[in-house]
């Protein structure tokens, strides 16, 4: 995409957005040029809240499929567009409704906590949904005397168990991008930047090992990373998450330096959303995301509980 072509395309996207009475929501892992045309860039919790409060008739969701589903469930009266229907999620794909039903059959009084990175059919079986930003707070409020099943990310679940002191049954799912970030990627970077603060996403597979290398690490959601970096006195940060966040970190804290633990930690699903696909989505109103009401109605309760916390 040439410079003029990119700028012209961005202008067309903004024109169509006004014409369609649309809002563009983008996750922090999106390509920089997609983030730049968005009305709001944030994490799953922020995006869900923004989708709930918008007055626009059309929501163009620049993220992955479960995020667009979430927007559609929370806004059944609005049109939700996903610029590329192939923008999936390996973590959301890892768990099936049958997995949850099998656990519930063994624990009839149990509570199912579903990470937002799940399909609508799994959310419909959950008691509450969480994001990485509010999982600890939500779980800490749950009754002490009932078993809890945390699905599907085992690393986030382990972090929540550590932080709350609660015993959780964990589904063995993982995000392939975050699971691939290892201690060996971190060691040399910390040695090269001894004064840097270390920001790590709770989905990372190296959680305990990385904390051993850097005990004062900050385990944060993507939104938490942005907020922390802006307010911290440190000038350098080592960052363990998908590299799309770097664009936002540099934009919101331009006087600071950010170093990715794994420069090739790229979610190919997030990167399927391009500026051209956003343009075509708005132009042709294509790839409408719909969730059947019998599923959406049950999932909505769990999502509304999530949006209310944190």
Curated annotation (Swiss-Prot):
Pathway: Cofactor biosynthesis; NAD(+) biosynthesis; quinolinate from iminoaspartate: step 1/1
Annotated Gene3D superfamilies: NadA-like
Stored Pfam families: NadA
InterPro entries on file: NadA, NadA_sf, Quinolinate_synth_type2
Source taxon at top rank: Bacteria
Alphabetically ordered keywords of this record: 4Fe-4S, Cytoplasm, Iron, Iron-sulfur, Metal-binding, Pyridine nucleotide biosynthesis, Transferase
Function description: Catalyzes the condensation of iminoaspartate with dihydroxyacetone phosphate to form quinolinate.
Protein name per the record: Quinolinate synthase
């Amino acid at each position: 995409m040439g410079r003029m072509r990119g700028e012209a395309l961005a202008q067309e996207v903004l024109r169509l957005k006004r014409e369609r009475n649309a809002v563009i929501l983008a996750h922090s892992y999106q390509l920089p040029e997609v983030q730049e045309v968005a009305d709001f860039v944030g994490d799953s919790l922020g995006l869900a809240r923004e989708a709930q409060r918008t007055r626009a008739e059309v929501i163009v969701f620049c993220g992955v499929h479960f995020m667009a589903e979430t927007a559609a469930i929370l806004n059944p009266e609005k049109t939700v567009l996903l610029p590329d229907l192939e923008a999936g999620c390996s973590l959301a794909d890892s768990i099936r409704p049958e997995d949850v039903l099998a656990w519930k059959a063994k624990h009839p009084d149990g509570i199912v906590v579903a990470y937002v990175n799940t399909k609508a059919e799994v959310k419909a079986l959950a008691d509450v949904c969480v994001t990485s930003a509010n999982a600890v707070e939500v779980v800490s409020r749950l009754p002490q005397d009932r078993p809890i099943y945390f699905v599907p990310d085992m690393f986030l679940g382990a972090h929540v168990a550590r932080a709350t002191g609660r015993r959780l049954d964990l589904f063995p799912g993982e995000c392939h991008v975050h699971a691939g970030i290892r201690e060996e990627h971190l060691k040399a970077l910390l040695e090269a930047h001894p004064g840097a603060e270390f920001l790590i996403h709770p989905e990372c597979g190296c959680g305990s090992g990385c904390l051993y290398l850097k005990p004062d690490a900050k385990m944060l959601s993507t939104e938490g990373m942005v907020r922390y970096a802006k307010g911290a006195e440190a000038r350098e940060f080592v960052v363990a998450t998908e590299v799309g966040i770097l664009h936002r970190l540099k934009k919101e804290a331009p006087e600071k330096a950010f170093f990715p633990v794994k420069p090739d930690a790229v979610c190919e699903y997030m990167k399927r959303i391009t500026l051209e696909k956003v343009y075509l989505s708005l132009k042709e109103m294509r790839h409408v995301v719909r969730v059947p009401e019998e599923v959406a109605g049950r999932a909505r309760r769990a999502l509304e509980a999530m949006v209310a916390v944190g």
